[in-house]
Structures are given as structure tokens and as C-alpha cells.
Amino acid sequence: MTHSPTRRKLLIGFPLLAGAIVAPAAFAQNSSPLADIERRQGGRLGFYAIDTGTGRTLEHRAGERFLMCSTFKGMLAAQVLARVDAGKEQRERLVHYTAQDLIFTSPVTKANVARGALPVHTLCQAIVEQSDNTAAILLMRSVGGPAALTQFMRGIGDSVTRSDRYEPDSNRYSGVLDTTTPQAMATAARAVLLGDVLSLQSRAQLERWMIDCKPGLNRLRAVLPAGWQAADRPGTSVEEETNDYALVRPPGRAPLLVAAYYDAPGVSMDAREAVLREAGKVFVQWASASV
């Protein structure tokens, strides 16, 4: 992975002041509000954000591994789009399936099962916008399986993220299988959404799908100021994991990348999402302080 030569790590320490604009000097203390959130709420919070205009970063456990859950779906869609760009796949190619292929959380494939097939681009849209699990399985098979997604990640400069299993097994912890780090995922998102991994058309399409993503509305993007556009891809396991990463475009400045991964066994999803929103407020204050 590459980093801006102006990159500097920031440790921030001040009470969380809703809606405040904090001077940059306030981000140079000895404790982090992200660590404070973790201490108060329990669990393990991983966080990484980067301002692509300045190289400034905000980090907490940014290099620790977390289960990807459905955050892998954004990268899988990027891989399929890259194959389309390279002439190895066709957007309109029909992928056939039956009712026996359906698993839980598959709204698009379930609604269209009587048709017996859906186009590749519809399956991509389904996994990004609605986290359709059956569509993810069908697309994963089409690219060559989890190992092929890992290979794609290596090809875009990500030496950390790994895909090992299909849904739903990929949502269960087993060592390092199906894990990433907040820094790795945010950096990969930067590569596919802002870099030259995809054609301009494919980058715009992926970002549009992520803007229209429904499952992440109560996470990071829920606390962004009016006018800040966000394109995100969340991930969740029922038992413990609640994740989100996003490309954020504040008006009149360079884009921001942010990734938050929260592992809290036994805590309800509503409570876990509240932790991501709280972390998101810290992110907004940090980003606002750099203006």
C-alpha cells in the first residue's frame, strides 16, 4: 500500500462536542476520543481515516485485523467491474441460478428467482446496494472463488485483506480468515474509487451504487454534516461485528476515506451501530479541524 509523503499520524484528545469546529491544535494531545469510546462501550474499535488532500490521518487500532463481513462486497463488485473493463466479463451476461441457491438476506435474487437468471451488473448492484448474499455467492463463483478476490486485492496493492470462504461462513471468526484492517480497507477503497484500478465509468458506477447503499444509513454517514456526500459499504455479523467504510466528499475540498470496524460480542446491533456513529462524530470533528 502507498502513503502520501505528507502523512502524519494524529493523536486527538478532547471531549466530544457535537457540532463543534475544533482548531487543528486540539488534535495533538495524549489521548484519543476513539480510545475513550472503546473504554466506555467495551469491545474493540478499529478506525482509519485519511484526508486525500493533505495526507493527514486519524487512527485507532488501524492495523489490527477484523472480520470483513459484507464489507468485502464492495471489493467484489470492483473486481467484477475491473473484469468488465478488461473485456473478461460482460455487464449484460446472464448468471443462472435456482431457488436452491438462495440463502438469507437475498432480496434481489429472491424476488427474481422465477426468471432463473440475472445480469452481472444487476448482481453487482444487488450486493453493494442491498447486501444480497446469494448475488455475492454467484459473483464470487464467477470470478474464481475467494482466492481470486484475494489475488485481486494483492493486485491493487493490498497485502493484508484476504477472502477465504463463501457466505455465510465468511461471517464467522476463524483466525485470520476473511479479515482486513481498517487501514487496508480504506486504502483499497481509495484505489478503486479514486485511483486507476477501474475505468472512469466503472468508478462512477461503483460510487453511485455505494451512495445508494441502504444497510449503512445508521452508521458513519448518519452523522455527516449536510452537504457531505458519502458512498459506503457496511458489513455485519449477527453475533459481534459491525463495520462500515466510506468515501466522503465534503463540499469544496479533497475527498476523505474512512473505515470503522467494531467487534463487540454479545452487544446488540443497535448498540454497535451507535458506537460507529459516535466514532463518526470524532471523524467529522477531525476533518472539520483541517479546513
At which residue positions do the language-model features occur?
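Conserved catalytic neighborhood of penicillin-recognizing serine enzymes
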Residues: L102-L138, P146
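Active-site SXXK
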Residues: G55, L67-V95, V258
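Structured C-terminal helix/loop/strand segments within mature extracytoplasmic catalytic/sensor domains
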Residues: T2-P5, K9-P15, Q29-A35, R141-S142, ...
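Mid-domain, small-residue-enriched loop/turn segments at the edges of structured enzyme/sensor domains
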Residues: R44, I137-V197
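Short, well-structured active-site flanking segments
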Residues: A82-D101, T150, S199-S202
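Beta-lactamase-like hydrolase cores
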Residues: A26-L67
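Soluble periplasmic/extracytoplasmic beta-strand elements of cell-envelope proteins
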Residues: G46-I50, E59, M75, H96, ...
